[in-house]
Protein backbone atom coordinates (compact mmCIF):
# COMPACT_ATOMS: atom_id res chain seq x y z
CA UNK A 1 0.00 0.00 0.00
CA UNK A 2 1.07 3.60 -0.59
CA UNK A 3 1.92 6.20 1.96
CA UNK A 4 -1.57 7.81 1.72
CA UNK A 5 -4.06 5.01 2.43
CA UNK A 6 -7.17 7.19 2.80
CA UNK A 7 -7.94 10.77 1.80
CA UNK A 8 -11.62 11.71 1.77
CA UNK A 9 -14.19 14.41 2.58
CA UNK A 10 -17.34 13.77 4.60
CA UNK A 11 -20.15 16.19 5.44
CA UNK A 12 -21.76 16.41 8.87
CA UNK A 13 -24.67 14.00 9.46
CA UNK A 14 -24.21 12.57 5.97
CA UNK A 15 -26.13 15.43 4.35
CA UNK A 16 -26.03 15.93 0.60
CA UNK A 17 -28.65 18.69 0.07
CA UNK A 18 -28.40 22.22 1.50
CA UNK A 19 -30.29 25.50 1.21
CA UNK A 20 -28.72 28.85 0.26
CA UNK A 21 -27.41 30.72 3.31
CA UNK A 22 -26.90 27.52 5.34
CA UNK A 23 -23.60 26.55 7.00
CA UNK A 24 -21.85 23.57 5.45
CA UNK A 25 -19.67 21.62 7.87
CA UNK A 26 -17.58 18.52 7.38
CA UNK A 27 -14.29 16.75 7.96
CA UNK A 28 -11.25 15.91 5.86
CA UNK A 29 -9.87 12.50 6.88
CA UNK A 30 -6.35 11.27 6.14
CA UNK A 31 -4.87 7.83 6.91
CA UNK A 32 -1.12 7.42 6.41
CA UNK A 33 1.01 4.31 6.34
CA UNK A 34 4.18 6.38 6.81
CA UNK A 35 5.05 9.98 7.74
CA UNK A 36 4.17 12.52 5.04
CA UNK A 37 5.88 15.92 4.74
CA UNK A 38 3.64 18.64 3.32
CA UNK A 39 3.65 22.33 2.46
CA UNK A 40 -0.05 22.93 3.22
CA UNK A 41 -3.41 21.19 3.57
CA UNK A 42 -6.27 23.22 2.16
CA UNK A 43 -10.01 22.79 1.58
CA UNK A 44 -12.07 24.80 -0.92
CA UNK A 45 -15.82 25.21 -1.41
CA UNK A 46 -16.76 26.00 -5.02
CA UNK A 47 -20.00 26.69 -6.91
CA UNK A 48 -19.99 27.18 -10.68
CA UNK A 49 -21.89 26.67 -13.93
CA UNK A 50 -20.60 25.62 -17.33
CA UNK A 51 -22.32 25.39 -20.74
CA UNK A 52 -21.15 23.66 -23.92
CA UNK A 53 -22.24 23.71 -27.57
CA UNK A 54 -22.17 19.90 -27.75
CA UNK A 55 -24.12 17.37 -25.73
CA UNK A 56 -22.24 15.66 -22.90
CA UNK A 57 -19.11 17.73 -23.54
CA UNK A 58 -17.37 19.22 -20.48
CA UNK A 59 -15.21 21.57 -22.54
CA UNK A 60 -17.27 24.57 -21.46
CA UNK A 61 -17.77 27.43 -23.91
CA UNK A 62 -19.18 29.75 -21.22
CA UNK A 63 -18.71 29.56 -17.44
CA UNK A 64 -19.77 31.57 -14.41
CA UNK A 65 -18.83 31.24 -10.74
CA UNK A 66 -21.03 31.73 -7.68
CA UNK A 67 -18.61 31.28 -4.77
CA UNK A 68 -15.04 30.13 -4.15
CA UNK A 69 -13.84 30.03 -0.54
CA UNK A 70 -10.69 28.37 0.82
CA UNK A 71 -9.48 27.40 4.28
CA UNK A 72 -6.01 26.35 5.42
CA UNK A 73 -6.31 23.23 7.58
CA UNK A 74 -2.60 22.87 8.34
CA UNK A 75 0.59 24.78 7.57
CA UNK A 76 3.98 23.40 6.54
CA UNK A 77 5.04 20.36 8.53
CA UNK A 78 4.92 16.57 8.59
CA UNK A 79 2.02 14.23 9.33
CA UNK A 80 2.94 11.10 11.29
CA UNK A 81 1.60 7.69 10.32
CA UNK A 82 -1.98 6.98 11.41
CA UNK A 83 -5.36 8.69 11.06
CA UNK A 84 -5.90 12.46 11.09
CA UNK A 85 -9.12 14.51 10.97
CA UNK A 86 -9.43 18.17 9.98
CA UNK A 87 -12.86 19.78 10.57
CA UNK A 88 -14.02 22.69 8.41
CA UNK A 89 -17.08 24.91 7.95
CA UNK A 90 -18.28 27.25 5.19
CA UNK A 91 -21.29 29.56 4.93
CA UNK A 92 -23.13 29.08 1.63
CA UNK A 93 -24.17 32.32 -0.12
CA UNK A 94 -27.85 33.26 0.03
CA UNK A 95 -27.83 33.75 -3.76
CA UNK A 96 -26.44 30.31 -4.67
CA UNK A 97 -28.55 28.72 -7.45
CA UNK A 98 -30.14 25.28 -7.33
CA UNK A 99 -27.95 22.41 -8.54
CA UNK A 100 -28.71 21.13 -12.02
CA UNK A 101 -27.16 18.79 -14.57
CA UNK A 102 -28.21 18.51 -18.20
CA UNK A 103 -26.71 17.38 -21.52
CA UNK A 104 -25.45 20.86 -22.47
CA UNK A 105 -24.44 22.24 -19.08
CA UNK A 106 -24.62 21.92 -15.33
CA UNK A 107 -24.55 23.81 -12.05
CA UNK A 108 -22.16 22.05 -9.69
CA UNK A 109 -21.34 22.71 -6.04
CA UNK A 110 -18.44 20.81 -4.49
CA UNK A 111 -15.84 20.69 -1.74
CA UNK A 112 -12.23 20.03 -2.73
CA UNK A 113 -9.29 19.14 -0.50
CA UNK A 114 -5.58 19.02 -1.35
CA UNK A 115 -2.35 18.04 0.38
CA UNK A 116 0.43 20.09 -1.19
CA UNK A 117 3.69 18.19 -0.87
CA UNK A 118 7.29 19.42 -1.31
CA UNK A 119 8.70 20.00 -4.75
CA UNK A 120 9.03 16.95 -7.03
CA UNK A 121 6.44 15.04 -4.96
CA UNK A 122 2.89 14.34 -6.09
CA UNK A 123 0.09 16.41 -4.54
CA UNK A 124 -2.90 14.49 -3.20
CA UNK A 125 -6.43 15.68 -4.05
CA UNK A 126 -10.03 14.63 -3.44
CA UNK A 127 -13.47 16.19 -3.91
CA UNK A 128 -17.11 15.73 -2.90
CA UNK A 129 -20.19 17.05 -4.71
CA UNK A 130 -23.14 18.37 -2.70
CA UNK A 131 -26.45 19.80 -3.85
CA UNK A 132 -28.18 23.11 -3.23
CA UNK A 133 -31.94 23.54 -3.47
CA UNK A 134 -33.43 27.02 -3.50
CA UNK A 135 -37.16 26.20 -3.12
CA UNK A 136 -39.58 27.86 -5.53
CA UNK A 137 -42.71 29.05 -3.73
CA UNK A 138 -45.47 28.99 -6.33
CA UNK A 139 -47.48 31.51 -4.31
CA UNK A 140 -44.90 34.18 -5.18
CA UNK A 141 -45.90 33.99 -8.87
CA UNK A 142 -48.71 36.42 -9.83
CA UNK A 143 -52.08 34.83 -10.75
CA UNK A 144 -50.67 31.34 -10.17
CA UNK A 145 -54.02 30.13 -8.78
CA UNK A 146 -55.97 31.27 -11.85
CA UNK A 147 -57.07 28.91 -14.64
CA UNK A 148 -54.76 28.64 -17.64
CA UNK A 149 -56.69 28.93 -20.94
CA UNK A 150 -55.75 29.12 -24.62
CA UNK A 151 -57.59 28.59 -27.90
CA UNK A 152 -56.68 28.10 -31.57
CA UNK A 153 -58.72 27.93 -34.78
CA UNK A 154 -57.53 25.98 -37.82
CA UNK A 155 -59.17 26.39 -41.24
CA UNK A 156 -58.52 23.70 -43.84
CA UNK A 157 -59.76 22.17 -47.08
CA UNK A 158 -60.87 18.61 -47.71
CA UNK A 159 -62.31 16.66 -50.61
CA UNK A 160 -60.71 19.24 -52.92
CA UNK A 161 -63.59 21.73 -52.87
CA UNK A 162 -64.89 21.69 -49.30
CA UNK A 163 -63.61 23.83 -46.47
CA UNK A 164 -64.02 23.63 -42.72
CA UNK A 165 -62.44 24.62 -39.46
CA UNK A 166 -61.62 23.22 -36.04
CA UNK A 167 -61.66 25.23 -32.83
CA UNK A 168 -59.39 23.76 -30.14
CA UNK A 169 -59.59 25.16 -26.60
CA UNK A 170 -57.53 23.86 -23.68
CA UNK A 171 -57.42 24.87 -20.02
CA UNK A 172 -55.91 23.76 -16.71
CA UNK A 173 -57.17 24.37 -13.19
CA UNK A 174 -53.95 26.12 -12.06
CA UNK A 175 -50.81 27.63 -13.55
CA UNK A 176 -48.37 25.94 -11.18
CA UNK A 177 -47.91 22.50 -9.63
CA UNK A 178 -45.58 20.54 -7.36
CA UNK A 179 -44.24 17.00 -7.73
CA UNK A 180 -46.97 14.40 -7.23
CA UNK A 181 -49.82 16.85 -7.90
CA UNK A 182 -52.41 16.10 -10.59
CA UNK A 183 -52.64 18.58 -13.43
CA UNK A 184 -56.34 18.80 -14.38
CA UNK A 185 -56.74 19.20 -18.14
CA UNK A 186 -59.93 20.24 -19.94
CA UNK A 187 -60.08 20.34 -23.75
CA UNK A 188 -62.93 21.36 -26.05
CA UNK A 189 -62.87 20.51 -29.76
CA UNK A 190 -65.43 21.92 -32.20
CA UNK A 191 -65.20 20.13 -35.54
CA UNK A 192 -66.88 22.49 -37.99
CA UNK A 193 -66.33 20.25 -41.01
CA UNK A 194 -67.52 17.01 -42.58
CA UNK A 195 -64.22 15.24 -41.86
CA UNK A 196 -63.26 13.41 -38.66
CA UNK A 197 -60.24 14.73 -36.75
CA UNK A 198 -57.22 12.78 -35.60
CA UNK A 199 -56.87 11.85 -31.90
CA UNK A 200 -56.25 14.76 -29.53
CA UNK A 201 -52.91 14.57 -27.69
CA UNK A 202 -51.77 16.40 -24.54
CA UNK A 203 -48.05 16.52 -23.73
CA UNK A 204 -46.17 17.92 -20.75
CA UNK A 205 -42.96 19.40 -22.18
CA UNK A 206 -39.75 20.49 -20.49
CA UNK A 207 -37.60 23.13 -22.22
CA UNK A 208 -34.11 23.77 -20.86
CA UNK A 209 -32.35 26.76 -22.43
CA UNK A 210 -28.54 27.00 -22.37
CA UNK A 211 -26.75 30.26 -23.14
CA UNK A 212 -23.56 29.36 -25.01
CA UNK A 213 -22.42 31.29 -28.10
CA UNK A 214 -26.10 31.22 -28.96
CA UNK A 215 -29.16 29.94 -27.12
CA UNK A 216 -29.59 26.17 -27.25
CA UNK A 217 -33.04 24.77 -26.42
CA UNK A 218 -33.34 21.18 -25.20
CA UNK A 219 -37.02 20.16 -25.41
CA UNK A 220 -38.28 16.78 -24.29
CA UNK A 221 -41.63 15.14 -23.57
CA UNK A 222 -42.17 14.31 -19.89
CA UNK A 223 -45.68 12.80 -20.07
CA UNK A 224 -48.24 12.28 -22.79
CA UNK A 225 -51.97 11.48 -22.88
CA UNK A 226 -53.92 10.60 -26.03
CA UNK A 227 -57.69 10.87 -26.45
CA UNK A 228 -60.06 9.86 -29.23
CA UNK A 229 -60.79 11.88 -32.35
CA UNK A 230 -63.88 14.02 -32.98
CA UNK A 231 -66.48 13.01 -35.56
CA UNK A 232 -67.60 15.31 -38.36
CA UNK A 233 -69.89 18.18 -37.33
CA UNK A 234 -69.46 17.35 -33.69
CA UNK A 235 -68.31 19.13 -30.57
CA UNK A 236 -66.44 17.06 -27.98
CA UNK A 237 -65.01 17.65 -24.52
CA UNK A 238 -62.08 15.81 -22.97
CA UNK A 239 -61.28 15.74 -19.27
CA UNK A 240 -57.97 14.18 -18.23
CA UNK A 241 -55.21 14.59 -15.67
CA UNK A 242 -51.43 14.26 -15.74
CA UNK A 243 -49.55 13.37 -12.57
CA UNK A 244 -46.50 15.63 -12.28
CA UNK A 245 -43.42 13.37 -11.98
CA UNK A 246 -40.18 14.22 -10.18
CA UNK A 247 -38.86 17.26 -12.05
CA UNK A 248 -36.46 20.13 -11.37
CA UNK A 249 -38.21 23.39 -10.56
CA UNK A 250 -39.00 26.07 -13.12
CA UNK A 251 -36.29 28.69 -13.61
CA UNK A 252 -32.96 28.70 -11.78
CA UNK A 253 -32.69 32.01 -9.87
CA UNK A 254 -29.10 33.16 -9.56
CA UNK A 255 -27.98 31.46 -12.79
CA UNK A 256 -27.88 33.43 -16.04
CA UNK A 257 -26.72 30.56 -18.29
CA UNK A 258 -29.46 27.93 -17.79
CA UNK A 259 -33.23 28.42 -17.65
CA UNK A 260 -36.02 25.82 -17.27
CA UNK A 261 -39.58 26.18 -18.60
CA UNK A 262 -42.54 23.81 -18.73
CA UNK A 263 -45.45 23.74 -21.17
CA UNK A 264 -48.65 21.77 -21.60
CA UNK A 265 -49.22 21.30 -25.32
CA UNK A 266 -52.60 20.08 -26.64
CA UNK A 267 -52.68 19.27 -30.35
CA UNK A 268 -54.39 17.61 -33.29
CA UNK A 269 -52.38 16.19 -36.18
CA UNK A 270 -55.19 16.32 -38.75
CA UNK A 271 -56.11 19.06 -39.17
CA UNK A 272 -52.98 20.50 -37.59
CA UNK A 273 -53.95 22.60 -34.57
CA UNK A 274 -51.96 23.28 -31.40
CA UNK A 275 -52.37 25.29 -28.21
CA UNK A 276 -49.59 25.72 -25.67
CA UNK A 277 -50.07 26.58 -22.00
CA UNK A 278 -47.04 27.61 -19.91
CA UNK A 279 -46.99 25.99 -16.45
CA UNK A 280 -44.69 26.33 -13.45
CA UNK A 281 -43.19 23.47 -11.44
CA UNK A 282 -42.26 24.45 -7.89
CA UNK A 283 -41.51 23.08 -4.43
CA UNK A 284 -44.22 24.82 -2.37
CA UNK A 285 -47.78 24.23 -3.58
CA UNK A 286 -50.39 26.87 -4.32
CA UNK A 287 -52.32 27.46 -1.09
CA UNK A 288 -55.42 28.97 -2.68
CA UNK A 289 -58.42 27.02 -3.89
CA UNK A 290 -58.29 26.86 -7.70
CA UNK A 291 -61.00 28.52 -9.77
CA UNK A 292 -62.49 25.81 -11.97
CA UNK A 293 -62.98 27.02 -15.53
CA UNK A 294 -66.08 26.10 -17.48
CA UNK A 295 -64.70 23.46 -19.85
CA UNK A 296 -64.49 24.67 -23.38
CA UNK A 297 -65.89 28.14 -22.68
CA UNK A 298 -62.88 29.98 -21.27
CA UNK A 299 -60.88 32.24 -23.52
CA UNK A 300 -57.72 34.29 -22.96
CA UNK A 301 -58.13 38.08 -22.72
CA UNK A 302 -58.57 39.71 -26.10
CA UNK A 303 -59.38 36.46 -27.90
CA UNK A 304 -62.34 36.52 -30.33
CA UNK A 305 -65.49 34.71 -29.20
CA UNK A 306 -66.11 31.20 -30.40
CA UNK A 307 -68.18 31.12 -33.60
CA UNK A 308 -71.07 28.67 -33.74
CA UNK A 309 -71.00 27.15 -37.22
CA UNK A 310 -73.94 27.19 -39.56
CA UNK A 311 -75.89 24.02 -40.13
CA UNK A 312 -74.14 21.30 -42.11
CA UNK A 313 -75.15 20.68 -45.73
CA UNK A 314 -78.68 19.40 -46.29
CA UNK A 315 -77.63 15.87 -47.25
CA UNK A 316 -75.37 15.53 -44.21
CA UNK A 317 -78.09 16.89 -41.90
CA UNK A 318 -80.61 14.39 -43.27
CA UNK A 319 -78.14 11.53 -42.84
CA UNK A 320 -77.46 12.64 -39.30
CA UNK A 321 -81.16 12.82 -38.45
CA UNK A 322 -81.76 9.37 -39.92
CA UNK A 323 -78.94 7.96 -37.81
CA UNK A 324 -80.38 9.59 -34.69
CA UNK A 325 -77.05 11.28 -33.91
CA UNK A 326 -76.68 14.13 -31.41
CA UNK A 327 -76.99 17.78 -32.39
CA UNK A 328 -73.75 19.70 -32.96
CA UNK A 329 -74.28 21.85 -29.89
CA UNK A 330 -74.66 18.77 -27.66
CA UNK A 331 -71.04 17.93 -26.78
CA UNK A 332 -69.88 14.36 -26.41
CA UNK A 333 -67.10 13.29 -24.07
CA UNK A 334 -63.91 11.80 -25.48
CA UNK A 335 -62.32 8.70 -24.00
CA UNK A 336 -58.59 8.37 -23.28
CA UNK A 337 -56.75 5.91 -25.53
CA UNK A 338 -53.30 5.89 -23.92
CA UNK A 339 -51.36 7.46 -21.07
CA UNK A 340 -47.57 7.31 -20.87
CA UNK A 341 -45.17 8.95 -18.45
CA UNK A 342 -41.42 8.93 -17.93
CA UNK A 343 -40.43 7.19 -14.71
CA UNK A 344 -37.93 8.61 -12.19
CA UNK A 345 -34.46 7.14 -12.43
CA UNK A 346 -34.18 5.88 -8.85
CA UNK A 347 -31.00 3.97 -9.65
CA UNK A 348 -29.00 7.19 -9.83
CA UNK A 349 -29.26 7.57 -6.05
CA UNK A 350 -26.76 4.75 -5.57
CA UNK A 351 -24.04 6.94 -7.06
CA UNK A 352 -24.50 9.62 -4.36
CA UNK A 353 -22.54 8.69 -1.20
CA UNK A 354 -24.66 8.92 1.92
CA UNK A 355 -27.80 9.92 0.05
CA UNK A 356 -31.09 9.55 1.93
CA UNK A 357 -33.74 7.09 0.80
CA UNK A 358 -35.91 8.19 -2.15
CA UNK A 359 -39.58 9.11 -1.89
CA UNK A 360 -41.85 6.16 -1.06
CA UNK A 361 -43.96 5.26 -4.05
CA UNK A 362 -47.00 4.41 -1.95
CA UNK A 363 -47.26 7.85 -0.37
CA UNK A 364 -46.15 6.65 3.07
CA UNK A 365 -44.30 9.14 5.30
CA UNK A 366 -40.58 9.56 4.89
CA UNK A 367 -38.41 7.66 7.33
CA UNK A 368 -36.54 10.79 8.45
CA UNK A 369 -38.81 13.16 10.40
CA UNK A 370 -36.58 16.22 10.07
CA UNK A 371 -36.26 16.51 6.31
CA UNK A 372 -38.68 16.37 3.37
CA UNK A 373 -38.37 13.34 1.08
CA UNK A 374 -35.55 13.16 -1.44
CA UNK A 375 -36.75 12.71 -5.01
CA UNK A 376 -34.94 12.05 -8.27
CA UNK A 377 -35.48 14.28 -11.27
CA UNK A 378 -36.12 12.73 -14.66
CA UNK A 379 -33.36 12.78 -17.23
CA UNK A 380 -29.84 13.73 -16.17
CA UNK A 381 -30.84 16.11 -13.40
CA UNK A 382 -29.81 15.93 -9.76
CA UNK A 383 -31.71 14.80 -6.65
CA UNK A 384 -33.72 17.42 -4.82
CA UNK A 385 -36.24 17.77 -2.01
CA UNK A 386 -39.98 18.13 -2.59
CA UNK A 387 -42.70 19.31 -0.24
CA UNK A 388 -44.92 16.71 1.46
CA UNK A 389 -44.47 13.05 2.22
CA UNK A 390 -45.85 11.54 -0.98
CA UNK A 391 -43.67 10.83 -3.98
CA UNK A 392 -44.52 10.66 -7.68
CA UNK A 393 -46.36 7.52 -8.74
CA UNK A 394 -45.09 6.38 -12.17
CA UNK A 395 -47.49 4.69 -14.55
CA UNK A 396 -46.87 1.28 -16.05
CA UNK A 397 -47.27 2.59 -19.59
CA UNK A 398 -44.60 2.83 -22.25
CA UNK A 399 -41.57 4.91 -21.29
CA UNK A 400 -41.15 8.09 -23.34
CA UNK A 401 -37.50 8.38 -24.25
CA UNK A 402 -35.68 11.72 -24.57
CA UNK A 403 -34.41 12.93 -27.96
CA UNK A 404 -31.41 11.14 -29.44
CA UNK A 405 -28.61 13.73 -29.50
CA UNK A 406 -26.01 11.60 -31.29
CA UNK A 407 -27.77 11.89 -34.65
CA UNK A 408 -28.17 15.67 -34.87
CA UNK A 409 -26.42 18.84 -33.91
CA UNK A 410 -28.91 20.82 -31.86
CA UNK A 411 -32.29 20.22 -30.23
CA UNK A 412 -35.36 21.05 -32.23
CA UNK A 413 -37.37 24.25 -32.11
CA UNK A 414 -38.72 25.39 -28.74
CA UNK A 415 -42.50 25.41 -28.13
CA UNK A 416 -44.28 28.73 -28.70
CA UNK A 417 -44.88 31.21 -25.93
CA UNK A 418 -48.30 31.89 -24.44
CA UNK A 419 -48.73 35.03 -26.56
CA UNK A 420 -47.65 33.23 -29.72
CA UNK A 421 -50.07 30.38 -29.10
CA UNK A 422 -53.00 32.72 -28.51
CA UNK A 423 -52.15 35.16 -31.29
CA UNK A 424 -51.36 32.70 -34.05
CA UNK A 425 -47.74 33.88 -34.39
CA UNK A 426 -45.26 31.35 -35.66
CA UNK A 427 -42.79 30.34 -32.92
CA UNK A 428 -39.15 31.20 -33.38
CA UNK A 429 -35.98 30.20 -31.64
CA UNK A 430 -35.10 33.31 -29.66
CA UNK A 431 -33.40 33.88 -26.31
CA UNK A 432 -36.62 35.34 -24.92
CA UNK A 433 -38.75 32.31 -25.83
Curated annotation (Swiss-Prot):
Which SUPFAM superfamilies does this one have? E set domains (SSF81296)
Q: Return the Pro residues bias intervals.
A: 301-312
| GO molecular function terms noted in the UniProt entry | arrestin family protein binding; identical protein binding; ubiquitin protein ligase binding; ubiquitin-like ligase-substrate adaptor activity
Keyword Translocase part of the UniProt annotation: no
Alphabetical keyword list: Cell membrane, Membrane, Ubl conjugation
Q: Which Pfam families does the UniProt record give?
A: Arrestin_C, Arrestin_N
Where do we find the motif PPxY motif 2 here?
A: 415-418
Biological process, per Gene Ontology: extracellular transport; extracellular vesicle biogenesis; negative regulation of Notch signaling pathway; protein transport; protein ubiquitination; ubiquitin-dependent protein catabolic process
Please describe, based on the UniProt annotation, the reported consequence of changing residue 88 to L. Answer: Loss of localization to the cell membrane and extracellular vesicles. Localizes to the cytoplasm
Task: Tell me where the sequence motif PPxY motif 1 sits in this chain.
Answer: 402-405
* Record annotation: effect of changing residue 403 to A: Loss of interaction with ITCH
A GO cellular-component term linked to this record? cytoplasmic vesicle
Query: Known InterPro entries for this protein?
Result: Arrestin-like_C, Arrestin-like_N, Arrestin_C-like, Arrestin_domain-protein, Ig_E-set
The protein's PTM annotation reads:
Ubiquitinated. Ubiquitination by WWP2; promotes localization to extracellular microvesicles. Ubiquitinated by WWP1.
- The segments labelled Disordered in the record are 296-322, 349-372
Does this entry carry the keyword Cell membrane? yes
Describe its function: Functions as an adapter recruiting ubiquitin-protein ligases to their specific substrates. Through an ubiquitination-dependent mechanism plays for instance a role in the incorporation of SLC11A2 into extracellular vesicles. More generally, plays a role in the extracellular transport of proteins between cells through the release in the extracellular space of microvesicles. By participating in the ITCH-mediated ubiquitination and subsequent degradation of NOTCH1, negatively regulates the NOTCH signaling pathway.
Sorted alphabetically, which PANTHER family does this protein's record hold?
A: ARRESTIN DOMAIN CONTAINING PROTEIN (PTHR11188), ARRESTIN DOMAIN-CONTAINING PROTEIN 1 (PTHR11188:SF176)
UniProt family annotation: Belongs to the arrestin family.
What note about domains is in the entry?
The PPxY motifs mediate interaction with WW domain-containing ubiquitin-protein ligases.
Designated name of the protein: Arrestin domain-containing protein 1
Amino acid sequence: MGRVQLFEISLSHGRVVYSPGEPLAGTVRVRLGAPLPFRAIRVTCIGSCGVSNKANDTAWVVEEGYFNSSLSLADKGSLPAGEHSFPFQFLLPATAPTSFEGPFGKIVHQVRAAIHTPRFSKDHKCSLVFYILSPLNLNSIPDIEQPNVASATKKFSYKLVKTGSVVLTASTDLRGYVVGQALQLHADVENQSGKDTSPVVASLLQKVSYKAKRWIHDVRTIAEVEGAGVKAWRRAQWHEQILVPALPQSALPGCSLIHIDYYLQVSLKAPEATVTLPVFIGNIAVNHAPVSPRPGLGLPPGAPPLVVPSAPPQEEAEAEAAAGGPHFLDPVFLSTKSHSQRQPLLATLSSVPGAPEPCPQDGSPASHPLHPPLCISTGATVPYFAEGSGGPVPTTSTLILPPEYSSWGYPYEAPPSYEQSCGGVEPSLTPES
